[in-house]
Amino acid sequence: MIKLLYPQFWQERNIIAYLLLPISLIYQFLSYLRASLAYPVILPAQVICVGNCSVGGTGKTQIVIYLAKLLKAKNVPFVIITKAYGSHIKSTTIIQKGHTALEVGDEGIMLARYGTVIAAKYVKDILPLINELKPDVIIVDDFLQNPYLHKDFTIVSVDSQRLFGNRFLIPAGPLRQNPKQVLDAADLIFLVSSNQDQIPNELTPYIDKLINAQIVPSNNIDKNKNYFAFSGIGNPQRFFLTLENYRLNIVGYKIFPDHYNYLQADLENLYSLAKEHNAILITTRKDYVKFNYLNDEIICLDVELSINNPDLLNEKIFKKAKILN
Protein backbone atom coordinates (compact mmCIF):
# COMPACT_ATOMS: atom_id res chain seq x y z
CA MET A 1 0.00 0.00 0.00
CA ILE A 2 1.38 3.39 -1.03
CA LYS A 3 1.25 5.92 1.79
CA LEU A 4 1.18 9.57 0.80
CA LEU A 5 0.65 12.87 2.53
CA TYR A 6 -1.98 15.16 0.99
CA PRO A 7 0.06 17.28 -1.49
CA GLN A 8 -0.76 20.95 -1.96
CA PHE A 9 -1.49 20.53 -5.68
CA TRP A 10 -4.42 18.27 -4.74
CA GLN A 11 -6.06 21.36 -3.29
CA GLU A 12 -4.89 24.00 -5.81
CA ARG A 13 -4.01 23.04 -9.37
CA ASN A 14 -0.46 23.60 -10.55
CA ILE A 15 1.85 22.22 -13.22
CA ILE A 16 2.30 18.93 -11.35
CA ALA A 17 -1.46 18.31 -11.34
CA TYR A 18 -1.72 18.91 -15.08
CA LEU A 19 1.28 16.67 -15.80
CA LEU A 20 -0.40 13.85 -13.90
CA LEU A 21 -3.77 14.35 -15.59
CA PRO A 22 -3.21 11.68 -18.31
CA ILE A 23 -2.71 9.08 -15.57
CA SER A 24 -5.95 10.26 -13.96
CA LEU A 25 -7.78 9.58 -17.23
CA ILE A 26 -6.37 6.05 -17.25
CA TYR A 27 -7.50 5.63 -13.64
CA GLN A 28 -10.99 6.82 -14.61
CA PHE A 29 -11.20 4.35 -17.50
CA LEU A 30 -9.98 1.42 -15.39
CA SER A 31 -12.46 2.27 -12.63
CA TYR A 32 -15.30 2.35 -15.17
CA LEU A 33 -14.17 -0.96 -16.65
CA ARG A 34 -13.93 -2.58 -13.22
CA ALA A 35 -17.42 -1.44 -12.26
CA SER A 36 -18.88 -2.57 -15.59
CA LEU A 37 -17.53 -6.10 -15.23
CA ALA A 38 -18.28 -6.60 -11.54
CA TYR A 39 -21.00 -8.85 -10.12
CA PRO A 40 -21.85 -7.43 -6.67
CA VAL A 41 -22.13 -9.80 -3.72
CA ILE A 42 -25.49 -9.44 -1.95
CA LEU A 43 -25.16 -10.01 1.79
CA PRO A 44 -28.09 -11.37 3.89
CA ALA A 45 -28.59 -8.11 5.83
CA GLN A 46 -29.13 -4.41 5.24
CA VAL A 47 -25.81 -2.93 4.12
CA ILE A 48 -25.09 0.68 5.11
CA CYS A 49 -22.00 1.97 3.31
CA VAL A 50 -20.06 4.93 4.70
CA GLY A 51 -17.52 6.35 2.27
CA ASN A 52 -16.22 9.40 0.46
CA CYS A 53 -15.29 10.46 -3.04
CA SER A 54 -11.81 11.70 -2.18
CA VAL A 55 -8.59 10.50 -0.61
CA GLY A 56 -7.78 11.60 2.91
CA GLY A 57 -9.72 11.90 6.14
CA THR A 58 -13.28 13.13 5.77
CA GLY A 59 -14.61 11.97 9.13
CA LYS A 60 -16.14 8.71 7.94
CA THR A 61 -14.73 6.68 10.84
CA GLN A 62 -16.58 8.94 13.29
CA ILE A 63 -19.76 8.45 11.25
CA VAL A 64 -19.34 4.68 11.49
CA ILE A 65 -18.93 4.97 15.27
CA TYR A 66 -22.01 7.21 15.49
CA LEU A 67 -24.06 4.64 13.58
CA ALA A 68 -22.74 1.81 15.73
CA LYS A 69 -23.81 3.63 18.90
CA LEU A 70 -27.20 4.40 17.37
CA LEU A 71 -27.88 0.79 16.37
CA LYS A 72 -26.66 -0.51 19.72
CA ALA A 73 -29.03 1.85 21.54
CA LYS A 74 -31.89 0.44 19.44
CA ASN A 75 -30.78 -3.16 20.15
CA VAL A 76 -30.24 -3.80 16.44
CA PRO A 77 -27.73 -6.63 15.80
CA PHE A 78 -24.99 -5.24 13.59
CA VAL A 79 -21.50 -5.92 12.28
CA ILE A 80 -18.87 -3.47 11.03
CA ILE A 81 -16.68 -4.32 8.04
CA THR A 82 -13.41 -2.49 7.53
CA LYS A 83 -10.66 -2.80 4.92
CA ALA A 84 -7.78 -3.14 7.40
CA TYR A 85 -5.62 -0.44 5.80
CA GLY A 86 -2.00 -0.43 6.90
CA SER A 87 -2.12 -3.99 8.24
CA HIS A 88 -0.43 -7.27 7.38
CA ILE A 89 -3.75 -9.11 7.25
CA LYS A 90 -3.61 -12.33 5.25
CA SER A 91 -7.28 -13.35 5.34
CA THR A 92 -10.66 -11.91 6.31
CA THR A 93 -11.10 -12.25 10.07
CA ILE A 94 -13.24 -11.20 13.03
CA ILE A 95 -11.20 -8.83 15.19
CA GLN A 96 -10.60 -10.23 18.66
CA LYS A 97 -9.16 -8.83 21.86
CA GLY A 98 -5.41 -9.16 21.56
CA HIS A 99 -5.23 -8.31 17.87
CA THR A 100 -2.86 -5.47 17.03
CA ALA A 101 -3.15 -2.61 14.55
CA LEU A 102 -0.37 -4.19 12.52
CA GLU A 103 -2.40 -7.41 12.24
CA VAL A 104 -5.87 -6.02 11.45
CA GLY A 105 -5.46 -2.26 10.90
CA ASP A 106 -5.70 0.79 13.14
CA GLU A 107 -9.30 1.55 12.17
CA GLY A 108 -10.34 -2.03 12.97
CA ILE A 109 -8.86 -1.87 16.47
CA MET A 110 -10.50 1.51 17.01
CA LEU A 111 -13.93 0.37 15.77
CA ALA A 112 -13.84 -2.88 17.79
CA ARG A 113 -14.59 -0.80 20.90
CA TYR A 114 -18.12 -0.29 19.56
CA GLY A 115 -19.14 -3.65 18.14
CA THR A 116 -18.14 -6.77 16.24
CA VAL A 117 -15.72 -5.90 13.44
CA ILE A 118 -14.67 -7.93 10.42
CA ALA A 119 -11.33 -6.98 8.91
CA ALA A 120 -11.86 -7.81 5.24
CA LYS A 121 -9.21 -8.61 2.68
CA TYR A 122 -11.60 -9.77 -0.08
CA VAL A 123 -15.36 -9.23 -0.41
CA LYS A 124 -15.93 -12.87 -1.38
CA ASP A 125 -14.63 -14.00 2.02
CA ILE A 126 -17.12 -11.90 4.01
CA LEU A 127 -20.24 -14.01 3.40
CA PRO A 128 -19.30 -17.07 5.56
CA LEU A 129 -18.61 -14.82 8.56
CA ILE A 130 -21.87 -12.90 8.05
CA ASN A 131 -23.78 -16.20 7.93
CA GLU A 132 -22.10 -17.13 11.20
CA LEU A 133 -22.81 -13.82 12.97
CA LYS A 134 -26.33 -13.27 11.52
CA PRO A 135 -26.57 -9.46 11.92
CA ASP A 136 -29.60 -7.42 10.82
CA VAL A 137 -27.37 -4.55 9.67
CA ILE A 138 -23.87 -4.40 8.22
CA ILE A 139 -21.96 -1.11 8.35
CA VAL A 140 -19.22 -1.10 5.73
CA ASP A 141 -16.42 1.40 6.18
CA ASP A 142 -14.94 2.79 2.95
CA PHE A 143 -16.36 0.36 0.36
CA LEU A 144 -18.09 3.07 -1.67
CA GLN A 145 -15.91 2.57 -4.75
CA ASN A 146 -15.93 -1.23 -4.44
CA PRO A 147 -18.29 -2.56 -7.15
CA TYR A 148 -18.15 -6.12 -5.81
CA LEU A 149 -20.39 -5.39 -2.82
CA HIS A 150 -24.09 -4.47 -3.03
CA LYS A 151 -25.10 -1.52 -0.85
CA ASP A 152 -28.64 -0.83 0.36
CA PHE A 153 -27.94 2.60 1.84
CA THR A 154 -25.03 4.96 1.22
CA ILE A 155 -23.65 7.78 3.34
CA VAL A 156 -21.06 10.11 1.83
CA SER A 157 -18.71 12.07 4.07
CA VAL A 158 -17.36 15.43 2.86
CA ASP A 159 -14.74 17.51 4.64
CA SER A 160 -15.91 21.13 4.64
CA GLN A 161 -12.37 22.57 4.47
CA ARG A 162 -11.01 20.50 1.59
CA LEU A 163 -14.32 19.69 -0.13
CA PHE A 164 -13.27 18.08 -3.43
CA GLY A 165 -9.82 19.61 -3.71
CA ASN A 166 -8.74 20.58 -7.23
CA ARG A 167 -11.55 18.45 -8.77
CA PHE A 168 -9.09 16.07 -10.49
CA LEU A 169 -9.07 12.30 -10.07
CA ILE A 170 -6.13 10.41 -8.55
CA PRO A 171 -3.18 11.02 -8.92
CA ALA A 172 -3.61 14.54 -10.35
CA GLY A 173 -6.09 15.27 -7.58
CA PRO A 174 -7.64 13.67 -4.50
CA LEU A 175 -10.82 12.33 -6.11
CA ARG A 176 -11.59 8.64 -6.32
CA GLN A 177 -14.80 9.28 -8.23
CA ASN A 178 -16.77 12.13 -9.81
CA PRO A 179 -18.37 14.07 -6.91
CA LYS A 180 -21.69 14.73 -8.67
CA GLN A 181 -22.08 11.05 -9.46
CA VAL A 182 -21.43 10.14 -5.82
CA LEU A 183 -23.62 12.86 -4.30
CA ASP A 184 -26.54 12.20 -6.65
CA ALA A 185 -26.57 8.53 -5.65
CA ALA A 186 -26.08 9.09 -1.90
CA ASP A 187 -28.90 8.60 0.58
CA LEU A 188 -27.27 10.93 3.10
CA ILE A 189 -24.39 13.42 2.93
CA PHE A 190 -22.42 14.42 6.01
CA LEU A 191 -20.61 17.76 5.86
CA VAL A 192 -17.90 17.28 8.47
CA SER A 193 -15.72 19.92 10.06
CA SER A 194 -14.52 21.24 13.39
CA ASN A 195 -15.64 24.76 12.51
CA GLN A 196 -18.24 25.38 9.83
CA ASP A 197 -20.40 28.45 9.21
CA GLN A 198 -22.17 27.89 5.91
CA ILE A 199 -23.02 25.25 3.32
CA PRO A 200 -20.73 25.25 0.25
CA ASN A 201 -22.43 26.03 -3.07
CA GLU A 202 -21.61 22.55 -4.40
CA LEU A 203 -23.79 20.98 -1.71
CA THR A 204 -26.85 23.27 -1.79
CA PRO A 205 -28.68 21.05 -4.34
CA TYR A 206 -28.55 18.25 -1.76
CA ILE A 207 -29.93 20.18 1.20
CA ASP A 208 -32.75 17.65 1.71
CA LYS A 209 -30.25 14.90 2.51
CA LEU A 210 -27.46 16.97 4.05
CA ILE A 211 -26.39 16.68 7.69
CA ASN A 212 -23.97 19.16 9.23
CA ALA A 213 -21.60 17.44 11.64
CA GLN A 214 -18.85 18.60 13.94
CA ILE A 215 -16.04 16.57 15.44
CA VAL A 216 -15.72 17.57 19.09
CA PRO A 217 -13.50 16.35 21.95
CA SER A 218 -15.13 13.80 24.25
CA ASN A 219 -12.54 13.43 27.02
CA ASN A 220 -11.07 15.82 29.56
CA ILE A 221 -7.46 16.89 29.06
CA ASP A 222 -5.44 19.15 31.37
CA LYS A 223 -5.28 22.57 29.69
CA ASN A 224 -2.50 23.81 31.96
CA LYS A 225 0.21 21.70 30.30
CA ASN A 226 2.16 21.92 27.05
CA TYR A 227 1.51 19.37 24.32
CA PHE A 228 3.41 18.23 21.25
CA ALA A 229 0.94 16.81 18.73
CA PHE A 230 1.55 14.14 16.11
CA SER A 231 -0.63 12.03 13.84
CA GLY A 232 -0.62 9.63 10.92
CA ILE A 233 -4.16 10.11 9.60
CA GLY A 234 -5.74 11.24 6.34
CA ASN A 235 -6.51 14.78 7.47
CA PRO A 236 -4.11 15.88 10.21
CA GLN A 237 -5.13 19.52 9.80
CA ARG A 238 -8.55 18.73 11.25
CA PHE A 239 -6.92 17.08 14.26
CA PHE A 240 -4.73 20.12 14.89
CA LEU A 241 -7.71 22.45 14.44
CA THR A 242 -9.68 20.42 16.99
CA LEU A 243 -6.80 20.79 19.45
CA GLU A 244 -6.74 24.55 18.90
CA ASN A 245 -10.50 24.83 19.32
CA TYR A 246 -10.15 22.86 22.56
CA ARG A 247 -7.70 25.59 23.65
CA LEU A 248 -4.83 23.27 24.41
CA ASN A 249 -1.34 24.76 24.42
CA ILE A 250 0.20 23.05 21.37
CA VAL A 251 3.91 23.88 21.16
CA GLY A 252 4.65 21.83 18.04
CA TYR A 253 3.42 19.09 15.78
CA LYS A 254 4.64 16.40 13.40
CA ILE A 255 2.73 14.78 10.52
CA PHE A 256 3.16 11.19 9.35
CA PRO A 257 1.52 9.46 6.34
CA ASP A 258 -1.97 8.00 6.74
CA HIS A 259 -2.07 4.60 8.53
CA TYR A 260 1.61 4.97 9.36
CA ASN A 261 3.28 2.11 11.24
CA TYR A 262 5.58 3.84 13.71
CA LEU A 263 9.16 2.70 14.20
CA GLN A 264 11.18 2.88 17.40
CA ALA A 265 13.25 5.65 15.82
CA ASP A 266 10.06 7.68 15.26
CA LEU A 267 9.13 7.35 18.92
CA GLU A 268 12.58 8.36 20.09
CA ASN A 269 12.42 11.43 17.85
CA LEU A 270 8.96 12.36 19.14
CA TYR A 271 10.04 12.01 22.76
CA SER A 272 13.06 14.19 22.03
CA LEU A 273 10.90 16.89 20.42
CA ALA A 274 8.45 16.83 23.33
CA LYS A 275 11.27 17.07 25.86
CA GLU A 276 12.75 20.09 24.05
CA HIS A 277 9.44 21.90 24.51
CA ASN A 278 8.77 20.61 28.04
CA ALA A 279 5.64 19.01 26.61
CA ILE A 280 3.58 15.83 26.64
CA LEU A 281 2.88 13.90 23.44
CA ILE A 282 -0.73 13.95 22.25
CA THR A 283 -2.25 12.09 19.31
CA THR A 284 -5.47 10.69 17.81
CA ARG A 285 -7.27 7.53 18.89
CA LYS A 286 -6.39 5.95 15.53
CA ASP A 287 -2.69 6.49 16.25
CA TYR A 288 -2.99 5.73 19.95
CA VAL A 289 -4.15 2.14 19.39
CA LYS A 290 -0.66 1.40 18.05
CA PHE A 291 0.94 2.36 21.38
CA ASN A 292 -0.94 0.28 23.95
CA TYR A 293 2.31 -0.40 25.78
CA LEU A 294 2.92 3.35 26.15
CA ASN A 295 -0.49 4.39 27.46
CA ASP A 296 0.99 6.37 30.35
CA GLU A 297 3.40 8.32 28.16
CA ILE A 298 1.13 9.48 25.31
CA ILE A 299 -2.16 11.35 25.68
CA CYS A 300 -5.05 10.44 23.39
CA LEU A 301 -7.60 13.02 22.25
CA ASP A 302 -10.91 11.20 21.96
CA VAL A 303 -13.53 12.80 19.73
CA GLU A 304 -17.13 12.19 18.80
CA LEU A 305 -19.56 13.34 16.14
CA SER A 306 -22.14 16.00 16.92
CA ILE A 307 -24.83 16.40 14.26
CA ASN A 308 -27.37 19.16 13.65
CA ASN A 309 -30.26 17.00 12.45
CA PRO A 310 -30.54 13.63 14.24
CA ASP A 311 -34.21 13.36 13.22
CA LEU A 312 -33.25 13.30 9.52
CA LEU A 313 -30.67 10.60 10.21
CA ASN A 314 -33.16 8.49 12.16
CA GLU A 315 -35.81 8.89 9.48
CA LYS A 316 -33.48 7.92 6.65
CA ILE A 317 -31.74 5.07 8.46
CA PHE A 318 -34.73 3.43 10.09
CA LYS A 319 -37.28 4.01 7.34
CA LYS A 320 -35.52 4.02 4.00
CA ALA A 321 -33.00 1.38 5.06
CA LYS A 322 -35.95 -0.63 6.44
CA ILE A 323 -34.37 -1.20 9.83
CA LEU A 324 -36.75 -2.11 12.68
CA ASN A 325 -39.58 -2.61 10.15
Swiss-Prot record:
InterPro entries, per the entry: LpxK (IPR003758), P-loop_NTPase (IPR027417)
Record-level GO cellular component terms: plasma membrane
UniProt xrefs under Pfam families: LpxK
Pathway linked to the protein: Glycolipid biosynthesis; lipid IV(A) biosynthesis; lipid IV(A) from (3R)-3-hydroxytetradecanoyl-[acyl-carrier-protein] and UDP-N-acetyl-alpha-D-glucosamine: step 6/6
Alphabetical list of SUPFAM superfamilies matching this protein: P-loop containing nucleoside triphosphate hydrolases
NCBIfam families listed in its UniProt record: lpxK
Protein name: Tetraacyldisaccharide 4'-kinase
Annotated source species: Rickettsia prowazekii (strain Madrid E)
Originating gene: lpxK
